[in-house]
Amino acid sequence: MTRAPGVLIGVDVGCTTLSGGLVTPDGNVLSAMQAPTSLGAGTAVPTILGIVADLHAEAQARGLALEAVGIGVPGLVDAERGMLLHSAGSQVADLHRVPLAELVSAKTGVPAFVDNDVNALALGEWMFGLGRRAASCVVLAIGSALGAGIILDGRLVRGKSGFAGEFGHVPIDFGGPPCPCGGRGCLSLYVGGEYIAAEARQRISREPSSLLALAGGEAGAITAETVFAAAAAGDPLARSMVDRACRALGAGLAITVNGLNPEVVVVTGGVVKSLLPLQGEIIRRAGEYALADSLAGTPIHFVPGHKSQTVRGGAALVLYERARRGAGLPR
């Protein structure tokens, strides 16, 4: 009897959108679907299980054998137990301390793995994307905040407590504003979309700006994208914020290449679309802080985030964990 071709399910739990897809072991996304993450208290787990069940049914209808499920979630994850321990996003608070991998495995009858979403994203870029064939690869993901996924010498770096990659909470301004993490002047405060938008909404009440008009007169409608568009049109307030974001991200890249010396760096996420015209300025700023030889020898790619990329990350997590656990390697 011929065995059905194998397929994986990759899931990315974002703070606003949950994405899932069927992915072949070589990274080809066969189909994908999305659902809002913010559906109300108690809905995160049923929404995830529902998308997984729908994808499992689709795999069966296609004559494909589901092999495993990989899920990326935002926050601190216990990868061995397959659960989210803590996240700053209230949208996923329902997942805290929930044995998600166990629940998904019980639903599907196949192994399930859970890790930090940026770790999964980094594994996807390393296996299927711009980090292919590199022994070391760092992914900086810039969405509402900034996080990093680190592959060094072919191993995902999680750190002793799972906090490795929290580059968004590296202080770059010791006298800067307070961060929700308890620190001050953290990198995320200057480049994260949520923080850029919040600061702009706050400052328009006391500084002249076209931002309110661009947002249709609604301060709450101002987003990071609004700020970048206003800066491109010459708005002084927006330009000052975008210039600072370029300097801050340049410093973040310098920290990355000086501290880790990776073969390749990928900057991705929802904010990156707005950063594309500013790549040259960001790299120039990085050159002001980085060791020249380290920066010159490291390709830095800017890639806007997209659904297939995050879904592949979940599939890559499966492949990585199966290989790691099969070899008996520590996490």
Write out the residue ranges for each language-model feature.
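Short glycine-rich, Thr/Ser-proximal phosphate-binding strand/loop in the N-terminal lobe
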Residues: 2-50, 83-86, 162, 329
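Short glycine-aspartate micro-motif
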Residues: 8-12, 66-70, 113, 137-141, ...
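Glycine-rich phosphate-binding/hydrolytic loop that grips phosphoryl groups
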Residues: 23, 113-116, 120-126, 273-331
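A mobile "lid/hinge" subdomain adjacent to the ATP/sugar-phosphate binding pocket shared
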Residues: 23, 188-264
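Glycine-rich phosphate-binding loop and adjoining helix at the ATP-binding site
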Residues: 37, 42-49, 53, 61, ...
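Glycine-rich beta-strand-to-loop/alpha-helix junction loops that act as flexible
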Residues: 69-75, 267-271
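Glycine-rich phosphate-binding loop plus the immediately following alpha-helix
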Residues: 112-118, 172-207
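Glycine-rich phosphate-binding loop of actin/hexokinase-like ATP-binding domains
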Residues: 134-190
